[in-house]
Amino acid sequence: GPGAAFGWRGSSRIPARRRDARHGVLAVSGLVLPDPATAYRVGVVVPPSNPVVEPELDVLLGDEILQYGARLPRFTGLSLEERNQRYLPAYAEALDQLYGLDVTCALVAMTGPNYQLGLDGDRALCAELTERFGAPVSTASLAIYRTLNSLGINRIQLLSPYPDWLTGETVRYWEGAGMTVVAVEHLLGEGQAFSAYETCTEEVVAHLQSVEPEADCAVLVTGTGLVSVASIYQMDYGCSRPILSSNLCGAWWILQQCDRSPGSRLYREIAPGHVPCEDPGPDCGPGCHEL
């Protein structure tokens, strides 16, 4: 029947629908379905080969928020450094692909290209894109900064999937933003090529476990193509040792734009220990960062 795709097999009629108490959600035969007419809509600009952003945001944002993606162009035959130069002016064209969707906000899920700009340049870029797009726009790098600023943290330990030259740009960005980078853990070995998209959760967890967390310091897993949600979930530093990632901070920023939507159940489990918390849970310790 017409409802087979939603698991309504064996029924000759479409079940009665009822609106869930949550924003933009319909409950149909026990299934929770987002209602595109009333759900929050958000745009996400993604690198062409990045397989991580949409799945991680999807499990963090919850049923009240629908994400609509626009992929950046594929630049073949160029080095990572050359691609990073070309991505920056391509953000605006990618956002144009979302025209007519009336999105609440848009996240440019990129960090690497933005680090060459420094914080002030990143802010200026997002302000320009916001004005052009007509809705709030943030890069993932600026979302990380806003998260750190809201947490009141100015010391970070960096987990970098980048080659040395881009790790250097990353460190300069954060130091220019007023952060003290106390340590850098490299995912790449000597002479190894950029491979964040092929890095599995177990590898990220192993590197995180090798980091000796310091007091009043956040561990930053940078790069939207690096698997982070499952990695953070498996770690147990406690609330006083937040682990931040590009996608977790991007999700936090999106939720703030969507009237501080609570996010998914998984997000609500992770958030109290790592990002500013709207409603801390009973298991959150003394280091919890309440808004």
Model regions: which residues?
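Glycine/small-residue-rich loop that forms an oxyanion/phosphate-binding "nest" at active or ligand-binding sites
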Residues: 98-136
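Hydrophobic alpha-helical
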Residues: 205-238, 249-251
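Short, well-structured alpha-helical segments in soluble
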Residues: 88-101, 203-216
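Periplasmic-binding protein-like
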Residues: 104-109, 157-159, 216-223
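N-terminal glycine-rich anion-binding loop in soluble enzyme alpha/beta folds
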Residues: 26-93, 164-200
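Conserved beta-alpha
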Residues: 125, 129-190, 271
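C-terminal functional extensions of proteins
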Residues: 245-284, 288
